[in-house]
């Protein structure tokens, strides 16, 4: 098994939920950290979720406020394991307001 560290990003996330990362086939992924930066001119509220193909979708973060010019790193040492075809999503209550940075380790 190979372990590969990767950085995934998604700029200008807004009201429409965006896929930041989809786990490739034959891969397990460990999410090491997620940072959400507010790039808008005002405060906004964000959410992070996991969409799974064969089970319930879940929220990791819901309606979390991020002040103007600030960022949020909400995992604080916790890890989340994702399986093949799981999708990590981000949304905001303000268009083009969030830059999302995801640090992961893929196990293949």
Question: Over which residues does each language-model region extend?
Answer:
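Residue-level detector of intrinsically disordered/flexible regions characterized by low predicted structural confidence
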Residues: 10-12, 40, 61
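A generic structural signal for short beta-strands and their flanking turns/coil linkers
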Residues: 30-32, 44, 62, 84-86, ...
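Intrinsically disordered, low-complexity Pro/Gly/Ser/Thr-rich segments with frequent PxxP/GP/PP motifs
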Residues: 53-87
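Short edge-strand/loop segments of extracellular domains
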Residues: 51-55, 107-108
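Beta-strand signatures of extracellular beta-sandwich domains
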Residues: 47-51, 101-103
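C-terminal interaction-tip segments
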Residues: 1-33, 91-108
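Short solvent-exposed strand-capping/beta-turn motif centered on an Asx-Ser/Thr pair
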Residues: 36-41, 53, 93-95
